[in-house]
Swiss-Prot record:
Subunit structure of this chain's protein: Homotrimer.
GO BP annotations listed: riboflavin biosynthetic process
Pfam family, one: Lum_binding
GO terms assigned for molecular function: riboflavin synthase activity
Protein name: Riboflavin synthase
Organism in which the protein naturally occurs: Chlamydia muridarum (strain MoPn / Nigg)
Length: 198
């Protein structure tokens, strides 16, 4: 479990494809307490730290993860968000994030205080005004929604401390809706489907 508060923006230093999977190495200066076996969110994707060589963190990525996230688009030099899993007693500064990416969206516009995204069809029911969403692992509040297009307010501090400062129009991002919102919407939809079926 994660909180959506990014602890470091780090650089992809190594990519090695083998079979249908791949290994990535990320150069992280500040994530000093990551040990092999621990869970770390990389752009909102929950990955297991396989090994560590000083400041270089290594992760194995499965074919399934590559298929449903932006990780397949990484190149050496890509800048990514990192967050270690929360521990008992940690402050939850954002919202609960599972690290299970539900879809890939696209940045369609960038303004001074707002960014606009196109959500994949399967996420649209869960994108609600004033609700939470994790974008590349960042806990953000949805400002406005128009169909599959939504906006979030992004303060300069967020741009500076996350990979959003490196993004541009057309960039793809990982999306995970707020799990509480998803549970509530799914329950209502299931209830309505059962009612119609009777």
């Amino acid at each position: 479990m994660f909180s959506g508060i990014i602890q470091e923006v780090a650089r992809v230093d190594l990519i090695h494809h083998y079979g249908d999977s791949m290994e990535i190495g990320i150069f992280a200066r500040n994530l000093v307490d990551g040990v092999p076996g621990s869970s770390i969110a990389v752009d909102g994707i929950c990955l297991t730290l396989v090994k560590r060589e000083f400041e270089l963190l290594f992760f194995d990525v499965t074919e399934e993860t590559m298929a449903c996230t932006t990780i397949k688009n990484y190149t050496v030099g890509s800048m990514v968000n990192l967050e270690r899993s929360v521990r008992l007693g940690d402050e939850i500064g954002g919202h609960f994030v599972s690290g299970h990416v539900c879809g890939v969206g696209t940045i369609i516009a960038v303004e001074k205080s707002y960014m606009f995204f196109k959500a994949p069809t399967n996420l649209v029911p869960y994108v609600l005004e004033k609700g939470f969403i994790a974008i590349d692992g960042i806990s953000l509040t949805i400002a406005q929604v128009r169909g599959d297009i939504f906006s979030v307010s992004v303060i300069p501090e967020t741009r500076a401390r996350t990979s959003l400062g490196y993004k541009q129009v057309g960039s793809h991002v990982n999306m995970e809706p707020d799990m509480m919102t998803k549970m509530q919407v799914d329950t209502v939809m299931r209830f309505q489907a059962e009612k119609i079926g009777k």
